[in-house]
Design a protein with these regions (language model features):
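Short acidic, glycine/serine/threonine-rich loops at helix termini
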Residues: 8-12, 45-47, 86, 140-141, ...
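Glycine-rich phosphate-binding loops of nucleotide-dependent enzymes
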Residues: 35, 58, 77, 90, ...
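Phosphate-binding/switch loop-helix module in NTP-utilizing enzymes
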Residues: 41-88
Length: 212
């Protein structure tokens, strides 16, 4: 987690990672090893970085962290097609990319560029996820499509990549991020919890397929 590093807060990981023999030790949260730049800098500090600094930070998180054996390493990248993405693809062989977009046309422009970039860099695009797909009223249960609906699915079909699922705009998703208890742990059978678990299963299946 490099840009806008909030991973540690969302996972409830507190404190600073240990350093053993010059290498950062990932912090454990909910059975997952995690490292975020947010663990290393003051929470109020603004990280204003140029391209070379971004690439240096990515290299540090990849090379200077004692990750050990992992099933999957997930890297959260900022929107767009900038230095962070190019640096990562040059540093390690990527198993695949998941593109996340809200449904409206203006957001899908960036998603389209992301798909094109990864394809040009020979990185498998595992698919698109539609975030904030709809708002579910907690009182009456009515769904309101604040940002439109189905844009990511249509874009995926147009570009010939899989559609991985949709995540609704829900108060409990916001609350889980603030509390540091992932929704798939705190409320796995809630609407949001089911959405996350379904997408995770689809992504895991796609990763296994590309690995073979």
């Amino acid at each position: 987690d490099g840009h806008g590093p909030s991973l540690h807060r969302m996972m409830g990981a507190k404190g600073k990672p240990d350093v053993v023999e010059g290498r950062l030790q990932p912090m454990q949260a909910w059975g997952i090893c995690a490292v975020s730049l947010g663990m290393l800098v003051d929470e109020k500090a603004a990280m204003i970085w140029r391209g070379p600094m971004v690439m240096g930070a990515i290299n540090q998180l990849l090379s200077d962290v004692d990750w050990g054996e992992l099933d999957v390493l997930v890297v959260d990248l900022p929107p767009g097609t900038g230095d962070a993405h190019l640096s990562l693809t040059q540093k390690v062989p990527l198993g695949g990319a998941v593109i996340v977009s809200t449904p409206q046309d203006i957001a899908l422009i960036d998603a389209r560029r992301g798909v094109t970039m990864f394809e040009k860099l020979h990185v498998p695009v595992l698919g698109l996820v539609e975030n904030m797909s709809y708002f579910c009223c907690p009182n009456c249960g009515h769904n309101t499509e604040l940002f439109g609906h189905g844009g990511a699915r249509r874009e995926a079909e147009a570009m010939g990549v899989p559609f991985l699922g949709e995540v609704p705009l829900l108060a409990d998703i916001r609350a889980s991020g603030d509390s540091g208890v992932p929704l798939v742990i705190g409320a796995p059978n809630s609407e949001g919890g089911k959405a996350y678990r379904a997408i995770a299963h689809t992504v895991a299946t796609a990763i296994q397929a590309t690995a073979h």
